[in-house]
């Protein structure tokens, strides 16, 4: 039976000769980065761009892994994975180019972390500051159970060393692409998640990407309004037990 998804897809199509036309208001362009100014900052180790196993081998190995050991993630490896997801790789004019593509280089996706076991970091909720390659400590404490509940009670998120929580700041893309921006936002999240899956695999960690969430439970956990910014995607990361592998 047709529903709102079918309606959205149909109404957001581009058709020849009927493209939406609007003048971009540069004075109202949303900020590219979200900032937490009055929180503790944790500078991350400089990521490496040399060495590592080959891309083709990483692609061959990649699986969704749901069974994890109790081993902690190292801060160095977390830094490497964060940079791989959407770290800055170059500067052209006013644009910071990143490891993942984004429609119009507008980068609507923000990265939050639920840290359960990372050496040198206290457990808590963090935000990844991309331009500074550092972490913003939002709240200290154990939040694995709450994240698990927000992920439809999938326990692998509670057992993971880290859970990546991606949100979308929709207006960053809507400013240019109007309603079609919602297509691009989710594509952007997919690019980022695949970068994470490959980087983690290259470092010997397992990941599982999760789209089944109670949106507003996770929004409340991160103090997001669910309108201007909302959680859209998760990924667990941990050292895997080599079993229960699926696509």
Name each model-derived stretch:
Residues 1-166, 170-171, 189, 203, ...:
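N-terminal accessory segments that position/regulate proteins before the catalytic core
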């Amino acid at each position: 039976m047709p529903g709102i998804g079918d309606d959205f897809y149909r109404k957001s199509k581009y058709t020849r000769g009927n493209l939406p036309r609007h003048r971009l208001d540069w004075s109202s362009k949303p900020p590219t980065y979200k900032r937490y100014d009055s929180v503790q900052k944790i500078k991350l180790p400089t990521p490496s761009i040399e060495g590592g196993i080959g891309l083709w081998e990483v692609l061959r190995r990649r699986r969704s892994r749901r069974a994890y050991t109790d081993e902690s993630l190292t801060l160095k490896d977390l830094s490497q994975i964060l940079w791989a997801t959407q770290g800055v790789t170059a500067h052209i004019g006013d644009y910071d180019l990143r490891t993942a593509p984004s429609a119009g280089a507008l980068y609507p996706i923000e990265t939050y972390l639920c840290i359960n076991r990372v050496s040198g970091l206290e457990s808590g909720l963090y935000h990844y500051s991309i331009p500074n390659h550092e972490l913003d400590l939002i709240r200290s404490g154990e939040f694995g159970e709450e994240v698990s509940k927000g992920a439809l009670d999938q326990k692998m998120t509670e057992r993971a060393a880290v859970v990546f929580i991606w949100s979308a700041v929709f207006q960053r893309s809507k400013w240019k692409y109007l309603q079609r921006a919602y297509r691009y936002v989710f594509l952007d999240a997919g690019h980022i998640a695949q970068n994470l899956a490959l980087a983690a695999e290259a470092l010997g960690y397992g990941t599982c990407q999760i789209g089944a969430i109670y949106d507003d439970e996770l929004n409340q956990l991160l103090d997001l309004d669910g309108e201007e910014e909302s959680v859209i995607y998760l990924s667990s990361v941990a050292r895997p037990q080599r079993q229960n592998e699926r696509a």
